[in-house]
């Protein structure tokens, strides 16, 4: 691939100057051309040799135009070959996959969920009647399960009947609670005794304890009036 543009450049030079063809291919310089500089040196060498041998004098303008034309064609051929090599270094493999974040929970999207396959007994047995859809063992299991459910429901109903309280009793109990003050008997501090109330420091005075105080107040008022 690398030698192709160089050979193309040599062919272009030979076509532009027909006399160069025979001399260039016979020489050892043109057989092994490792770089672009060698190709340019070879073309300049044989062009100068042809100019010395040719009897027709050429002007400087013609020489410059021919040189620029040949060099332009040579450089265009070389650059096109290099671009082709850079553009396609290796054929792209279709096996290249995108980066999948497998270490994350959302790395791979979940496809369609596998649903359980429903197998009907009618399709297995091939019967059309409703009684023949289930096998004998399945029908026995269903029958025993129904019996257990009926028994459990019966036991629950009997327990509920025993626990039922007459409505009249509940109504009277509610009325009694509304009439009387609610006492928190289920708490430790619901109804403390009179002695232990306020920690025993403030003992309630009895009716007899108030009598001396009342008589004292009466005497004071009588003295003030007199």
From Swiss-Prot:
UniProt propeptide residues: 23-97
Signal peptide interval: 1-22
Cell compartment(s), UniProt: Secreted
GO cellular component, one term: extracellular region
Single GO biological process annotation from the record: neuropeptide signaling pathway
Record Pfam families: ACTH_domain, NPP, Op_neuropeptide
UniProt keyword terms in alphabetical order: Acetylation, Cleavage on pair of basic residues, Endorphin, Hormone, Secreted, Signal
MF terms in GO: neuropeptide hormone activity
N-acetylserine PTM positions: 98
Modified residues annotated as N-acetyltyrosine in this record: 198
PTM entry text: Specific enzymatic cleavages at paired basic residues yield the different active peptides.
Entry's family note: Belongs to the POMC family.
PANTHER family membership: PRO-OPIOMELANOCORTIN
Protein name: Pro-opiomelanocortin
Native organism: Oncorhynchus keta (Chum salmon)
Gene assigned in the entry: pomc
